[in-house]
Amino acid sequence: MGSTALPYMATQPKLIFFTDFDGTITVDDSNDFMIDNLGFGRERRQQLNEKVLNETLGFRDAFREMLSSIKTPYDECIATLLKNMKLDPYFEKFYYWARDNNVPIVILSSGMKPIISALLEKFLGHKPGNHLHIVCNEVVPRDGKDINSEGGWQIQYHDESHFGHDKSIEIKPYAALPDSERPVLLYAGDGVSDLSAAAETNLLFAKAGKDLVTFCERRGMPYTTFQDWSTILSTTQDILAGKVSPADVATKSA
């Protein structure tokens, strides 16, 4: 098996943990914070979110409209987020447990890489180790401007899907492995863009009270809820130790 084609299999893990970033690893969503405080505001954002939930507007188009309302230079956006964003209080413990137990963490985000990298480095106090991978959207200049100038940046989507980043694409090659080779695949998320990814994994951790729970209920998709990463850590430890199966966890939550 080539580790180049399947990089998260390089260390032959028994479990791979895929996760959203904003509102999942962070307490609040950094994109929502920027839109509400630096862009057109909470009310308009919620109107567009409702259209996405009702499937009358694609996430890709809605998110681009939201971010386009932010004219603040990109470096100032990052500085603002570094002052205001908080890490889930238990994620750091999960991060080090995963490192010590050969569990790759793969962040699949609809956010932008410079923001995610800056926040992780601040939260952890160092650049993330090799067991943590980030797959997300990028930021590019707008109309030939510098991204650190007024109105100078825009999002560059990871792919052409209506999500802008179809997170399932990253997981499918691992889900397709033969039973004898395939590790347990887990996913944690909170929003609409996590739905495609969740369908490819053995167990979905959906953040309590968020849009992803609503979508799972509507579509009859099995999941278990979490309030913070302490639940995720204890459940993942039990799954890796063979004390419970992902199906058992989802069934108990039903």
Where are these regions (language model features)?
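C-terminal cap/substrate-recognition subdomain and adjoining C-terminal extension
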Residues: 2, 90-96, 100-104, 111-254
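Alpha-helical substrate-recognition element adjacent to the catalytic core
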Residues: 2-138
